């Protein structure tokens, strides 16, 4: 499972959400800050002929898009990464003003949900049907429709209308508005050496972060790109890395601007007064106290003070609770989610697989202070080459290459473990584990195809990733291929599992006996198995009303195909079996590792909430998210609890999280490495309505 990258036809809304990378020099020219580019009004011209594009991830060709123009425009878009990807067919009919008067989208999302979307203008009214249901609107409100499941070609559909508008801003259907900003002009070169002038743009209003793309000097789509993925005009594939690096730099500059506005650095010690401190050892809250921060350390935990000291900044905690910064243990780190995780009280990540160069750049930006984000602990991702492989980390074709990858990660010095993935040859795993352990690294991962969890336990895994990866071994035949969507759709078989059966008990007892961990990622399983078209996903109910309209729309979309009532029942019962399995694992002593594989932030709060359903108390959940994970990563001397001498990583909530864990969803203050952040400052920068007010600073 990896939701971390654009994984479905919803790509338009996710183009800038993933993260990272440094800005590549333009051809052989020296890299410079681009001058502001003025967006000029452009006439609406309908293209002719065929346009073709190549989809690429980290330099690898993974799919294509073809656009055929005639009386109508037909778009075919498909790519495959990690054994899955969207398949989209669109038919668009434009009026004389370039506005789609009919737009039909069909196909399947990355995880198999069927796409049957349509939009049509009839007279003075617009009618549309998407996963949320059917709606209509008067054309006086807006006449440009934002498709829910479109291909990246939708960027061009929107852009040419925005370019023709005076202020490059348009109200859109179903709600909201789009805004276009030109970024820079540059020249690219085709494989034949022909130069082409392009302009890059940022499109805002669809998602939390802008989408980045480029048009050529004729106004045609040239590319859409983020830090990992690029869809580029055929014949210009050599420009893919450059485009990705530009998208990364554009995003970095945006976040730099935001963090300059939201980061509070004080020139004297700061005391947070009148607070209770969560103690993960006693699983309780302290009496009312004050916590003093000097530079980036906790200097003292004292009694409440009655008046401000001229030598200190005093913040009124108003009787709220301080909790140590939390650990998102299944991240795929990206700059698009970094600041939002800080706002959610997540101050540490364990990255579970990434483009190694891109992640190095992100870590450098965070550690240098250029970007705000969690501390990142790295895992070395190793995948076997196959028609279904993921394109992260290092790809290998032989056991010797696999061992070489292990050694490379060990030599870097900052990877605490390796992560083995789906297409790895199971026969190579024992040697990889031996090498990793000899070099001081732990081993975690998926269960490779054509084997099972028992074999990986015997090979020496320290931790298994995703609860379905363990459970599939109890329901699949040996020749069934989990490199495909089968590893998700086969979860419909989980209701038949008998937790007390010998096979299940052997697996769980073996894990417990070896002191192994399970990173179950409950929230992603809930999302895959319980989300339904037209209904708000269960994990989003508590925050959806604060989100931008595009996110609210997305929240009412199924992730998997629910083709029949039997599918609905099977997935619901299968999810219940997942909870039963994780409860049994915990009861037997398997270490539970909390992570989302869904970007952390709001979903991380839901992940923690779900552990109450396996029998954990609220205090036990908070301890797991803080001190237990700091200990798991060998960082408990510095992080994981609020005590003098430790790093100042913690957050303030108005309520009592022991009485109600939902209190962690209303954070008023976050301190990370001695810098102070009010989520009420951060969220509006992403179009999110804050969940609570900032605390009062009593003296400055």
Feature roles, as predicted:
Residues 282-323:
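Histidine-rich, glycine-flanked metal-binding segment
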Residues 260-264, 277-290, 602, 617-622, ...:
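Acidic, glycine-enriched loop/beta-strand segments at the rims
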Residues 55-130, 219:
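N-terminal mature ectodomain segment of secretory-pathway/periplasmic proteins
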Residues 407-424, 470-614, 687-689, 698-700:
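Active-site neighborhoods of metal-dependent hydrolases
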Residues 22-25:
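C-terminal motif of bacterial Sec signal peptides marking the signal peptidase cleavage site
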Residues 338-358, 375-382, 412-424, 433, ...:
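Divalent metal-dependent hydrolysis catalytic cores, especially in the metallo-beta-lactamase
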Residues 45-48, 60-62, 112-199, 225, ...:
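Solvent-exposed helix/loop surface patches that form functional interfaces
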